[in-house]
């Protein structure tokens, strides 16, 4: 024990030496952070601000509305005198029009599971704002892609409503008609075409899966393996139904997973006080991280605690002591 104490003192002196300090990453000092790891261990609920969660909710509404407006507008611009584009998946698998039902049933299962986890979580106000922000970013990017790039529909059997004009009244009427169906064809038969680039179904499916995998209790984690298989089954069904090209699915998967992972990586970096030195913080939206995370308990962002949940309370107290011994 005496030798360990001497080693700690030597390391502490080395870290604070002027010549050697340049080899260590200096923690951020711009933001105040609550490092009380005992908050979650003791099961106490932190007093968190509600307005960041309401802001994230408003951002979801704007992102979703922008998708509906984009679809209502680009329907007039979809090329209807071209055959479906060549696709590797379409070359090897036949079209099964009813397969979309499988994808949407799976999507509803994942979505309901994710919502239950979010709204019953101990830190629900923080979890909800994180998830909603990721959804808002993903769907805003999709709206941009849909607006700037239109391709022919993937199947000759796809029905598209007759084109009219792009007047404000027509676009507004289409938005009102589509808004509450949430893009689910079981709730509203598909009539408008054009929202192909970046699959909206894929964004929802994989964001819901990641929410469950990240925030579900340990006893429910075996379900995440089943949900992972179901998520890819849903993607396969979307392609069989010819609702999207394969590139739309790939883009949807990439956008949803990268945004979710990047946000949580930045949140962990923020609470580890390495936010300013993290290259991911170069993202134009990274300024939202301090706004959303400054009142979150720090132990929610520890990788071992948050994702693997393999660290016991005893290990947490040891981690807490060892971390503060070097400050």
Swiss-Prot record:
Membrane topology, record value: Multi-pass membrane protein
One Pfam family from the record: PAP2_C
Signal peptide residue numbers: none
GO terms for MF: ceramide cholinephosphotransferase activity; sphingomyelin synthase activity
TM spans (from-to): 54-74, 99-119, 131-151, 192-212, 220-240
Stretches in topological domain Cytoplasmic: 241-327
CC terms in the record's Gene Ontology section: endoplasmic reticulum membrane; Golgi membrane; membrane; plasma membrane
Annotated family: Belongs to the sphingomyelin synthase family.
Name of this protein: Sphingomyelin synthase-related 2
Species name: Caenorhabditis elegans
Lineage: Eukaryota, Metazoa, Ecdysozoa, Nematoda, Chromadorea
